[in-house]
Amino acid sequence: SLLQFEMMIMEVAKRSGIFWYSA
Protein backbone atom coordinates (compact mmCIF):
# COMPACT_ATOMS: atom_id res chain seq x y z
CA SER A 1 0.00 0.00 0.00
CA LEU A 2 1.02 3.65 -0.25
CA LEU A 3 1.51 3.86 3.52
CA GLN A 4 3.98 0.96 3.47
CA PHE A 5 5.88 2.66 0.65
CA GLU A 6 6.11 5.91 2.61
CA MET A 7 7.37 4.05 5.68
CA MET A 8 10.00 2.31 3.56
CA ILE A 9 11.15 5.67 2.17
CA MET A 10 11.47 7.05 5.68
CA GLU A 11 13.55 4.04 6.75
CA VAL A 12 15.94 4.51 3.83
CA ALA A 13 16.15 8.23 4.53
CA LYS A 14 17.05 7.58 8.18
CA ARG A 15 19.74 5.06 7.27
CA SER A 16 21.19 7.38 4.65
CA GLY A 17 20.91 10.40 6.93
CA ILE A 18 18.95 12.12 4.19
CA PHE A 19 15.59 13.74 4.90
CA TRP A 20 14.42 14.68 1.43
CA TYR A 21 11.22 12.82 2.15
CA SER A 22 8.36 15.14 3.06
CA ALA A 23 4.83 14.04 3.95
From Swiss-Prot:
Top enzyme category: hydrolase
Keyword Ion transport: no
Post-translational modification: Contains 7 disulfide bonds.
UniProt-recorded Gene Ontology molecular function terms: metal ion binding; phospholipase A2 activity; toxin activity
Keyword terms of this UniProt record: Blood coagulation cascade inhibiting toxin, Calcium, Disulfide bond, Hemostasis impairing toxin, Hydrolase, Lipid degradation, Lipid metabolism, Metal-binding, Platelet aggregation inhibiting toxin, Secreted, Toxin
Entry EC no(s): 3.1.1.4
Highest taxon in the source lineage: Eukaryota
GO cellular component terms listed in the entry, alphabetical order: extracellular region
Tissue specificity note: Expressed by the venom gland.
Keyword Lipid metabolism applies: yes
Cofactor binding summary note: Binds 1 Ca(2+) ion.
Main subcellular location of this protein, as a coarse class: secreted
Localization of this protein: Secreted
Signal peptide: none
Cofactors, names only: Ca(2+)
Catalysed reactions, as listed in the record: a 1,2-diacyl-sn-glycero-3-phosphocholine + H2O = a 1-acyl-sn-glycero-3-phosphocholine + a fatty acid + H(+)
Protein's GO biological process: lipid catabolic process
Known function: Snake venom phospholipase A2 (PLA2) that shows high lipolytic (1200 umol/mg/min) and weak ADP-induced platelet aggregation activities. Also shows weak anticoagulant activity (IC(50) of about 1.0 uM). PLA2 catalyzes the calcium-dependent hydrolysis of the 2-acyl groups in 3-sn-phosphoglycerides.
Entry's family note: Belongs to the phospholipase A2 family. Group II subfamily. D49 sub-subfamily.
Extra facts: The subspecies C.h.atricaudatus mentioned in PubMed:20347857 is currently considered invalid. However, since different origins of specimens explain sequence variations, the specimen origins are indicated under strain in the reference section (in PubMed:20347857, South Carolina to C.h.atricaudatus).
Protein name: Acidic phospholipase A2 CHA-E6b
Organism: Crotalus horridus (Timber rattlesnake)
Species lineage: Eukaryota, Metazoa, Chordata, Craniata, Vertebrata
